[in-house]
Amino acid sequence: MAASASQGGRSGGGGGSSGAGGGPSCGTSSSRSGLLDKWKIDDKPVKIDKWDGSAVKNSLDDSAKKVLLEKYKYVENFGLIDGRLTICTISCFFAIVALIWDYMHPFPESKPVLALCVISYFVMMGILTIYTSYKEKSIFLVAHRKDPTGMDPDDIWQLSSSLKRFDDKYTLKLTFISGRTKQQREAEFTKSIAKFFDHSGTLVMDAYEPEISRLHDSLATERKIK
């Protein structure tokens, strides 16, 4: 990835203001600001094939995820991924049972069990499709912000994105869900990927990170005011 946010000038400034906006109180704002000032992005640059839409989207997603987890110190929640893995595991279980049962009881003796396993497998695949379409959607990160006092439930931050095929417009959406009120707010931007990659296909974090920080700060500031 690109050079550190503090060395990038404007990235460092954005990090400082992010800490002030997202702090729970005046006392913790200064310490959080200092933490963000020291934060830096991994020095290893991300270089991809600019014509590979999946690689472009994945690199932008991973970098946005890195900002929330490393800059703002949020804790990732793997609930969505665990749900998908559970469904896939159950599906594989039915496939394995069918294989073993057919080996132990050759067809046609195994026919009833095979039919049950095949039907169950396709039912689980249907459940997986519904889960990814309506539950996961395009969310690639769910992160929790712990309440400093430990009295209120965790605030939840979600990142989702989209990049249509043969389109250069990348959309990143950040969703904030208050742990105390359960109110949900969203902020997003849609920009050309050309703004974030140089001619060689290297992701320019000095251009990308401030956009993510602005999304976060707009929601964090609104949360603090309310």
From Swiss-Prot:
It is a multi-pass membrane protein. InterPro entries: Spc2/SPCS2. GO terms for cellular component: signal peptidase complex. It holds the Pfam family SPC25. The keyword Membrane applies. Keywords: Acetylation, Endoplasmic reticulum, Membrane, Transmembrane, Transmembrane helix. Residues 2-86, 133-226 are cytoplasmic. Its main location: endoplasmic reticulum. Residues 1-37 are annotated as: Disordered. Residues 108-111 are lumenal. Residues 9-25 have a biased composition (Gly residues). GO terms for biological process: signal peptide processing. It is found in: Endoplasmic reticulum membrane. The modification N-acetylalanine is found at residue 2. Belongs to the SPCS2 family. PANTHER family: MICROSOMAL SIGNAL PEPTIDASE 25 KDA SUBUNIT, SIGNAL PEPTIDASE COMPLEX SUBUNIT 2. Component of the signal peptidase complex (SPC) which catalyzes the cleavage of N-terminal signal sequences from nascent proteins as they are translocated into the lumen of the endoplasmic reticulum. Enhances the enzymatic activity of SPC and facilitates the interactions between different components of the translocation site. This is Signal peptidase complex subunit 2. It comes from Mus musculus. The gene is Spcs2.
